[in-house]
Amino acid sequence: MIDPDREQKKNGGVAEIIRQKTGMHLSPYFPAAKFAWLQENVEEVKQAKRDNDLCLGTIDTWLLFKLTKGEVYATDYSNASRTQLFNIHNLKWDKEICTWFGINADMLPEVCDSSMQYGTTDFEGYFQTPIPICGVIGDSQGALFGQGCIEKGMVKATYGTGSSV
């Protein structure tokens, strides 16, 4: 796994490469560092990785997986772009960055459009007929639509766990 402080001192380039590829500054705030920590410190996670049975994703990925009874392992571009592992230029998981964090890109979910049919759910039998899951979007990104920012030049500031403009 990458040690950002050591790597930065050693060659000064890792943080800049991450910023160029992901648009994000190297920080433990984002999931990449948290995924790396889990793999090094939680025995169940270590074992799942050894067994080639480890899946890593954000809350939307977990919700989709649970709601579809394990049939869908996916995320959307807005959530993938906030992991610090996703190359925003080629719209793929960046294998070089993943390697720095000790992550095999195959552990990460498929990345899809925000607006599409991901699967269906009966919500653990609550619905008699399964209903489609037709969208996934990050909270701050979704807040743009919720607040009516749908025209070029409109701006919104969101304050919560993180802040974004």
Which residues are covered by each model-predicted region?
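ATP-dependent carbohydrate kinase catalytic cores
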Residues: V72, D76-V165
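NAD(P)-dependent dehydrogenases' Rossmann-like dinucleotide-binding region
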Residues: L54-D60
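Class I SAM-dependent methyltransferase SAM-binding "motif I" and its flanking Rossmann-like core
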Residues: L38
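Active-site phosphate-binding/coordination module
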Residues: M1-A32, D139
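Flexible, glycine/proline-enriched loop segments at strand-loop-helix junctions
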Residues: Q20-P28, D51-L54, A80-I88, I133
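Rossmann-like flavin
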Residues: I18, N41-Q47
